[in-house]
Amino acid sequence: YVKELEAYCAELEKNHDEDHGEKLLFFTLDSYDNKTCIYNTTDIMLDHMMISAPATQILAGLGDGDQAGRMTDTVDAMDEMMELFYQHKGLTDKFAEGTDTSVIQKNRIPSRHLNIRYMKMFSGAFMYAGGNHIGIEWDSVKDLILTQKPSIDENGRLTGGAYFGWGIAHEIGHQINQGEYAITEVTNNYFAVLAQADGTNDSVRFSYDDVYEKVTSGATGYPSNVFTQLGMYWQLHLAYDPGFAQKTYATYQEAFDNLLFARVDTYARNPETFNSAGPEVELTLTGNQDQNLMRLVSAAAKKDLTTFFTRWGYVPDEETKSFMSQFEEETRALYYIDDNSRTAVLENKASDLAGQEVLAGVDVQTEHSDVTLKMT
């Protein structure tokens, strides 16, 4: 492919002049413009994504040296990232032998490819999602070529390299968002965090200090910052998924069993998947994303998450309260979890102070509504 690409790009201007250039005597009036000439195009078809971009920009992104290696790493990483995203939706093309046909039909990755496509942008934009494609500007095309393939360890933790940046994953998220609970510019970013989180607080786009302020404020409604709101969805992943962010699984059933949002989205697509088990209160969905989310997550976790969602400013209606109350109450303070603490647990580095005499003394000072604790 790289050899053909190099040869093709070398002939672009000549081919344009021969086929598209308007001639007057010895002059070509319609001169070649590499940003607009329709010949300057290459299509790269992958398992779940098609990249349609200027050939010269793909070649420029490959740089010098091991161009074929960089191309291979790039297409492999795109396939891996899409598989990761789809597994968190409970979608895959990998099913255990003997899986019921109806399960396969309802939970298979869509056959239609997503398309990352070079587009002329409207004012101020460099990337967007629309229809069944992601539009990117000229300068963003080169960034599709990875300089270092992501390295993922056996626990699903990103240890080196990177995927394709926040913007691409953000726009893909717009395309694959689950409509029953989607919040624009929030839930689509769950996929962007999946692509970059490495088990540390610094690797996510939001601030855990802002999360703490929200969940201790007692205020109803969403936080004003969409990235802070994203923290709620991420805390649910941290609380209920046993692996790190990039962990994928061999079959649909394994992904369903291990990924909270795989169950959430499966139940959203087909509530009967939950209801067929004969729950005390069946899952029904409404036109309200907040009520849907609370019901879906509680169903997926098999926990009454009233306290968690209330801390985040959600107000369950009577039907949602009834649905969540059939489950055992979640007693863990999930609204305080962060990446660092969860990584410490996964790596068996967390400290348990239960039963230990660790405080020699506590000094309490109060001034109006401020309380200062000094522990020794």
Segments (PLM) and residue ranges:
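Short, flexible/disordered intra-domain loops and linkers
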Residues: 62-67, 247-250, 276-287, 320, ...
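Catalytic cores of extracellular degradative/oxidative enzymes
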Residues: 22-253, 257-261, 265
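Long, domain-scale functional regions
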Residues: 71-75, 79, 257, 279-280, ...
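Acidic helix/loop microenvironments that form the catalytic cleft of cell-wall polysaccharide enzymes
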Residues: 192, 258-278, 313
